[in-house]
């Protein structure tokens, strides 16, 4: 990977998996080329990815942003290519809430055990507190909600089910729907 061009098959695959049109994908490809060109290399480095996504996730800490980069770097080569970039944007904007919550779970399940355990839950709570404070929620509202869905550990399925039932939680973690549907991100 690592390139900024999509084959017809890749474009068709992306359109099938996302709600993006052919025109959307063309625009995102152009945006990718501009955003990823700062270091004259193909694709987003970890630093460029974090800088780009920091706009939407400005309250997230550096370690969480690095984990996000690694999740989207699906081939593990240290560079986000155009296909990985478009997938990341879709996940952050137009993906169904349950997909976003599954992604959030994967982001914090650092040991890949299939469960969020005490230390991982603590990291999630820290992000929720920061995001919720920025949105005007009290710290206690954020912590109360997180601890209402789990005590010691929770599976991915339980997390997605519980969290998706709370609009407040979805807003607190900054995975809100894009209210302006004509914008791609």
Swiss-Prot record:
PROSITE patterns: EF_HAND_1, EF_HAND_2
Residues bound to Ca(2+) 1: 73, 75, 77, 84
InterPro entries the record matches: EF-hand-dom_pair, EF_Hand_1_Ca_BS, EF_hand_dom
Domain of life: Eukaryota
Keyword Metal-binding: yes
SMART domains: EFh
Domain EF-hand: 60-95, 96-131
SUPFAM superfamilies: EF-hand
GO biological process: regulation of signal transduction
GO MF term set: calcium ion binding
Record flagged with keyword Metal-binding: yes
Keywords, sorted A to Z: Calcium, Metal-binding, Repeat
Pfam families: EF-hand_1, EF-hand_5
Binding-site list for Ca(2+) 2: 109, 111, 113, 115, 120
UniProt family annotation: Belongs to the recoverin family.
PANTHER family linked: PROTEIN PHOSPATASE 3 REGULATORY SUBUNIT B ALPHA ISOFORM TYPE 1
Protein's UniProt name: Calcium-binding protein K-like
């Amino acid at each position: 990977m690592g390139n900024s061009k999509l084959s017809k098959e890749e474009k068709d695959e992306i359109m099938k998996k996302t709600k993006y049109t052919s025109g959307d994908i063309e625009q995102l490809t152009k945006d990718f080329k501009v955003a990823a060109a700062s270091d004259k290399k193909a694709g987003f480095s970890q630093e460029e990815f974090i800088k780009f996504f920091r706009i939407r996730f400005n309250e997230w800490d550096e370690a969480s942003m690095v984990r996000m980069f690694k999740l989207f770097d699906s081939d593990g080569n240290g560079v986000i290519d155009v296909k990985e970039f478009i997938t990341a944007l879709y996940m952050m904007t137009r993906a169904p809430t349950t997909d976003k919550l599954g992604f959030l779970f994967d982001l914090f399940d650092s040991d890949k055990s299939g469960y969020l355990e005490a230390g991982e839950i603590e990291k999630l709570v820290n992000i929720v507190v920061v995001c919720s404070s920025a949105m005007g929620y009290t710290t206690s509202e954020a912590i109360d909600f997180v601890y209402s869905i789990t005590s010691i550990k929770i599976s991915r399925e339980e997390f997605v089910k519980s969290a998706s039932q709370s609009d407040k939680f979805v807003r607190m973690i900054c995975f809100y729907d894009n209210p302006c549907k004509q914008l791609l991100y």
